[in-house]
């Protein structure tokens, strides 16, 4: 049974929990989920972004990806940095030949992905675009970017 992941709800995490259990049983840190047609959807609890030839790609929402807050934050960051983001259907093969790959999410924040299915992604380390996105993200969430101060609530 497939669950649509357009909202964070307990039932929607069932596939994610099962996928993550299977991934960790096989020695991986995280799972990458595909939609019912075999296109990349998201991680078990994160959105996924692919960098190829300087362009950032992410699955469009029709693939079942969650329209997450951190995902949308990355869209703002990319615009600020003059980087192009394209939402499209992404094949598993496109993941393997990516220059860079990263997850985003509330817990993941911006996390580089070094390999998938034991296939090294790009250089096997955090790439320059992922680094720019990650640094800008941490500047925002740590209050070092005044443009986004209105996003923060002091507690």
What are these regions (language model features)?
Residues 1-155:
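Helix-start/capping segments and mature chain N-termini
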């Amino acid at each position: 049974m497939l669950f649509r992941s357009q909202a964070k709800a307990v039932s929607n995490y069932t596939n994610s929990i099962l996928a993550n259990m299977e991934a960790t049983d096989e020695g991986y840190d995280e799972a990458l989920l595909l939609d019912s047609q075999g296109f990349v959807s998201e991680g078990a609890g994160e959105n996924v972004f692919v960098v190829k030839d300087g362009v950032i790609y992410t699955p469009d929402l029709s693939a079942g990806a969650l329209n997450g807050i951190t995902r949308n934050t990355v869209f703002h960051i990319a615009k600020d940095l003059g980087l192009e983001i394209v939402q499209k259907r992404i094949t598993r093969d496109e993941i393997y030949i990516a220059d860079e790959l990263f997850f985003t999410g509330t817990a993941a924040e911006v996390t580089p992905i070094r390999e998938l299915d034991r296939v090294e992604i790009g250089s096997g380390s955090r790439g320059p675009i992922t680094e720019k996105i990650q640094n800008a993200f941490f500047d925002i969430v740590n209050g070092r970017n005044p443009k986004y101060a209105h996003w923060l609530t002091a507690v």
